[in-house]
Regions:
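N-terminal catalytic or cofactor-binding beta/alpha core of small enzyme domains
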Residues: 1-140, 147-158, 163-169
Length: 170
């Protein structure tokens, strides 16, 4: 799915794609290197959500470049749904958003993290097999050291944050 909405109107396709996956207890994991421009988009989303007051009943994790260090804290939330947010070269214009299931993670080039997000999710699945894990990937514009977050990526993060802040499962 491509995020082509450049107005301030809600992106209904993106909203539906995200909210259709939200079942039970939710954890959102931001992955990325904040000193490498758009690669730090995962932690930036967590910061945006926290600055807006967090999300009731949702666990937020800024995992930086070492998500494997958060396996036990994530599992301790007993979440049913885990959403990873990371920069990835998805071959689209900067700021484009794609949602991937686990079976597609190994086919996408995720930013600068070792070990791969796939290994991380495999370890989580070992701890809780029925957890629904998916990835929201955003096409970066610049991942150079010291580069700022691009306007395109920041706009996509604000849209995603808007979706979560407006979401009401009842």
């Amino acid at each position: 799915m491509k995020n082509t909405n450049t107005s301030n109107e809600p992106d209904l396709e993106l909203t539906a794609a995200i909210t259709s996956r939200l079942k039970g207890k939710l954890a959102i994991v931001g992955i990325g290197n904040i000193i490498r421009g758009d690669d730090g988009l995962g932690p930036k989303l967590i910061e945006i959500l926290r600055n807006r007051g967090g999300l009731p009943g949702v666990s937020l994790f800024d995992c930086g470049t070492a998500p494997e260090n958060y396996i036990f804290p994530i599992l301790s939330t007993s979440c049913d749904t885990l959403m990873l947010v990371d920069a990835a070269d998805i071959g689209k214009e900067p700021g484009a958003v794609e949602i991937f299931d686990l079976d597609k993670i190994s086919r996408v080039s995720f930013s600068t993290h070792n070990p791969s997000p796939r290994l991380f999710t495999d370890l989580l699945k070992t701890g809780k097999e029925d957890m629904d894990i998916f990835v929201i990937s955003i096409q970066p514009k610049s991942t150079g050291i010291g580069a700022p977050l691009s306007e395109e990526v920041l706009n996509s993060l604000e849209r995603i944050a808007d979706i979560f802040c407006a979401y009401n499962p009842s």
